[in-house]
Structures are given as structure tokens and as C-alpha cells.
Amino acid sequence: MTSQQIDAEALYQSLVAQLRTRMAGTPAGDWSVAGIVSGGAWIAARLALDLGLREYGIVNVALHRDDYAKKGLHAQAQPTTLPFEVEERRILLVDDVLATGRTIRAAINELFDYGRPAAVELAVLVDRGERQLPIAPDYIGERIALAADESLVLRQEGEGASARFTFTREPKTA
């Protein structure tokens, strides 16, 4: 890894290994995957393929973030799409980077707008450890400390089974 890049593919493979261990012995139909727009949605789509899960959903947190407009994000980016019943389902919630916990809190609120899951487990490629809320991931690619003025940007090349991820460290924008 260079100082500017983090091996997102290696982190993804670590996440897959953890999830395969966790899901061993349970029917794939017991799980539904929901990824947070946009990096989490990319990861969720690939996890669904790699773990043999039937479907995955996309969660848009815009309506539940108190600082969305302040960060320059737009609510209309991509709507929440959950092609499964949330009620009494075991949901694997996926995001690329966990920092303050605010996005995860917003995603859980969005999921509960669709029903009451039996359980929600959280998987992230990177945990920055900058929590402002008591949120903890169940599955982590790696914990990585970044400077306060840095952010990680996930990019996806290709789609489906040929998709590959890369992370780049970039200066944080406002």
C-alpha cells in the first residue's frame, strides 16, 4: 500500500471470509443485504453474488441525516430500494467507511421505516474510529486511522462478478 492508496480488494476479501464464517450453517435465505448509497451499495451488490444471496437492497440515508445538506450531499441521489421484506429479516447493513456513526444511525432509521428487522449486523471495509455515536461494526476489513483533513474515496471498476474496488486518500472537502 502506498501512503495514498489502501488495498480495498484485500479488505473486501477479508470481509467476505468473515461473513462466510458467520453465515456457515445458516440458509442463505435467512439473510438480506442492504448497502448504503453509494459505496455500500456497490459492496452489497458484490457480496450478494460472492455469498450466494438472492437479493440486495440499497439504502439512501438522506432523509435521516441531520447534516446532509451541510455536507453538500443530495437526497435525490438514489432512492431506497429494498426488494425484500424488512419485517423479521436478518439484515446485513453494508458501508464502505465508518467514521462518526451518523450515516449508520440514519441507515438503521431508514430500515425501520420499512419494518422491524429481526436483527441488523454491520459490515464495513474501513473503520476510522472517529465515533460520535455508540455504533460498532460486526465485520471490518480493517481499522485505519486517517488525518482529520483526509477522507477515503471508494471507486468501483467493472460490475457484477468482475467488479473491483479501490480506495484513494483525498483531502476532505468542507
Swiss-Prot record:
Source organism per UniProt: Ralstonia nicotianae (strain ATCC BAA-1114 / GMI1000) (Ralstonia solanacearum)
Glycosyltransferase listed as a keyword: yes
Name under which the protein is recorded: Bifunctional protein PyrR
A Pfam short name: Pribosyltran
Residues that, per the record, bind substrate: 38-39, 95-103, 128
Enzyme class label: transferase
PROSITE patterns: PUR_PYR_PR_TRANSFER
Family per similarity comment: Belongs to the purine/pyrimidine phosphoribosyltransferase family. PyrR subfamily.
Keywords per UniProt: Glycosyltransferase, Transcription, Transcription regulation, Transferase
